[in-house]
């Protein structure tokens, strides 16, 4: 199954958003654990210098691969920045707000994804980051699709 992606020899930047989901589903169906899936994705995309951001975006259906990527990096003694969890105090909440952006951003995030401020505060940083990035990628993909449909309609 992975040969299908290898034959196309595509780079991560050229890959359509839907293909991320397809690749992730194939790897999950093959019963790979998180670290194996992450390594397979990196090898499949022929990109050894893949950034943390791209690795986090690869599988929109969950954070297992993002966590697997961190574990893999740690296993190989490579640096992979994971912000420390702040204390559950007002200072910690203020620190968390700065990490995510600012207080308005936290509130906006909570409203957009149907969560309370406390839930956002208690979410792992990687999860907050990945939800924002996946949402932005989905919106970009939708805008491109809308533009193509509009241009076909105008013809």
Residue ranges and their predicted role:
Residues 1-155:
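An amphipathic, hydrophobic-aromatic interaction surface with interspersed Lys/Arg
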């Amino acid at each position: 199954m992975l040969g299908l992606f290898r034959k196309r020899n595509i780079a991560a930047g050229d890959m359509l958003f839907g293909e991320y989901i397809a690749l992730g589903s194939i790897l999950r169906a093959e019963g790979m654990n998180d670290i194996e899936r992450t390594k397979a994705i990196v090898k499949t995309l022929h990109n050894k210098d893949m950034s943390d951001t791209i690795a986090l975006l690869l599988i929109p259906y969950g954070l297992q691969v993002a966590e697997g990527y961190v574990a893999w990096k740690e296993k190989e003694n490579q640096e992979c920045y994971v912000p420390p969890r702040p204390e559950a105090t007002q200072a910690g909440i203020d620190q968390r707000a700065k990490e995510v952006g600012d207080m308005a951003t936290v509130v906006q995030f909570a409203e957009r994804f149907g969560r309370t401020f406390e839930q956002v505060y208690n979410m792992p940083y990687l999860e907050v980051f990945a939800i924002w990035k996946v949402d932005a990628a989905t919106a970009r993909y939708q805008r491109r699709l809308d533009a193509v449909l509009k241009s076909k309609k105008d013809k």
